[in-house]
Amino acid sequence: MSCSVSLSFPDGSKRDYHSEMTGLELAESISKSLAKKALAYSLNGIIRDLSDPIKQSGQIEIITREDTRALELIRHDCAHVLAEAVQELFPGTQVTIGPVIENGFYYDFARQQPFTLDDLTIIEKKMREIIQRNKPFRKEVWSRKKAREIFSEKGELYKVELIDSIPDNQDLKVYYQGDWFDLCRGPHMQSTGQIGNAFKLMKVAGAYWRGDANNPMLTRIYGTAFANENDLKAYLHMLEEAEKRDHRRLGREMNLFHFQEEGPGMIFWHKKGWKMFQNLINYMRRRLDDHQYAEVNAPQVLDRSLWEISGHWEWYKENMFKAIPAAEDWDNENVYALKPMNCPGHVQIFKHGLKSYRDLPTRIAEFGVVHRYEPSGSLHGLMRVRCFTQDDAHIFCTDEQLADECLNINDLILSTYADFGFKEISLKLSTRPEKRVGSDALWDHAENIMESVLKTIETKSAGQIKTSILPGEGAFYGPKFEYTLKDAIGREWQCGTTQLDFNLPERFNAFYIDKDSEKRQPVMIHRAIFGSMERFLGILIENFSGHMPLWFAPEQIVVATITSEANEYAKKLTAKLKSVGLSTTLDLRNEKINYKIREHSLQKVPVILVCGKRESETNSVNMRRLGSTEQIFLSVEEVIEQLKNEATPPDLRRVINA
């Protein structure tokens, strides 16, 4: 019995088909060249194998190598080829899982002898052989009994465990590539040959089965793959550049911070690192003041009862650090927790004292220190820690004020990123997930407002801000905006958020009195610009490769002497520079000037002013900029005039120049 489906194509055309043709047959009906290039097809946003029949009407697209969605298919197939190569080369190795991740893929293997970096070269060679064989991917659907029996016979105990964990009503799909097969949901491309040669195995690491330290340790092989060689080369070059810019290495060289075993994920800030951190806070404090935020501070330790009301105790307890009063055991009901988030405390501040509609919008901000438990293996310098500071704010407003508040937040976020040199920003709106609080009418209303705001932002930016909508990706308590910035070497960092919350005001019975003297629940907006300030500082260090803008540098200027004859002049010069607000350090050490210059350059000091006998006699300096070999002779007045504006933060510069 034939089935009629109506398909809409990307060019706007529509066509009816009177049989359950496959995706490949559809591609062939359009053109032979398209069928040859086709990797998969998308029906109503869901990517499927080309061998799958088209059983329903909707929006259809044939995915080729040029499509951005092809990258996930290429990497997914590459992970399967990696697993086959390993089992060909190292019989007895068990395969476990091999997902696609950001910028690549990995596969975890169970083997008595862990793999080494030398093994990767051999495995990669075998992968190229398998790809060259150009074996078709073929899907079969098995019963649970059959899958269990076959994988048990193969000695694949981890696969058997996975089979047992799959819900009874879910199909068990197995994909073949030649004789080798693996349990997999799919989809896959037509054959291994479509993977191409633009891939590379990157590293070996240990990983616990299912991420649980109580389970066996596996060996994880990481790899990456791209649609073409040029993209692979560009990515590998970016990794080389990222290694040079690694904030952990620069943090040591610049003497900014360190970590110790006694405090995993806890930062020991040194003088210059702490100065940089304070520069970040001072900048944001001024911006908050300009946008009428009230800065507050809520307790770091609160009773579990508050976290139970907020829902954190139920949903986030495993990531919270708990505390108890002295001499009381853990079974005691009187348990406290270090705050993992600032929002419950801010709701308490809003609730303190009766609020009228005339008090709204109320904007509450805090540089709130939070503690969150992260597994030790996931800790990564400033980027992933257990204790960090959020530039957190919460806005309580009326429904009518929501759009204006979102636009106000957007202006603050974009201008902040621009002040730090980030020009390429993307903005995503995440909408309702399946599991959520609040009525459909409430979500409809909120999403309509935020979509309108999104269009306004896109129009105002003249297309410079890339916007998109992510259906189903919102939090259970409200839709959200996510701001992602691109750094100097093309990496993307998600930082800012604007998150609506239908949940907390209701849980805590937060209200205001409207103009009709009725109690109303306020609209609550969670807002962050930097997110984790420590992480943002790590991003800045890597973005600038430690060469911070003069206004943000922890040490702006060093005055270095060539000879002791210039010491008195250098002291007076340092005092004068400090008097006009320039952060200046004096170096009178009895060392050669080239040694001093090299040392301060390694410390990434933006400006070095060299003073010798000639400079002291002519009231001048020899100025050297970080990264330049040029020597510029200037009078002291010229130096001050040139550096003072540059050393002024951009937000203050705007006020001065207004």
From Swiss-Prot:
Q: Which GO terms describe its cellular component?
A: cytosol
Q: Where are the annotated segments for Catalytic?
A: 246-549
Q: Its GO biological process terms?
A: threonyl-tRNA aminoacylation
Q: Which UniProt keywords apply?
A: Aminoacyl-tRNA synthetase, ATP-binding, Cytoplasm, Ligase, Metal-binding, Nucleotide-binding, Protein biosynthesis, RNA-binding, tRNA-binding, Zinc
Q: Which residues bind Zn(2+)?
A: 343, 394, 526
Q: Show the SUPFAM superfamilies listed in the entry.
A: Class II aaRS ABD-related (SSF52954), Class II aaRS and biotin synthetases (SSF55681), TGS-like (SSF81271), ThrRS/AlaRS common domain (SSF55186)
Record-level Gene Ontology MF annotations: ATP binding; metal ion binding; threonine-tRNA ligase activity; tRNA binding
Q: What class of enzyme is it?
A: ligase
Indicate the transmembrane segments per the record. Answer: none
Q: How does it assemble?
A: Homodimer.
Q: Spell out the PANTHER family in the cross-references.
A: THREONINE--TRNA LIGASE, CHLOROPLASTIC_MITOCHONDRIAL 2, THREONINE-TRNA LIGASE
Function of the molecule? Catalyzes the attachment of threonine to tRNA(Thr) in a two-step reaction: L-threonine is first activated by ATP to form Thr-AMP and then transferred to the acceptor end of tRNA(Thr). Also edits incorrectly charged L-seryl-tRNA(Thr).
Protein name listed in UniProt: Threonine--tRNA ligase
Q: Which organism is it from?
A: Bartonella henselae (strain ATCC 49882 / DSM 28221 / CCUG 30454 / Houston 1) (Rochalimaea henselae)
Q: Which gene is the coding source of this polypeptide chain?
A: thrS
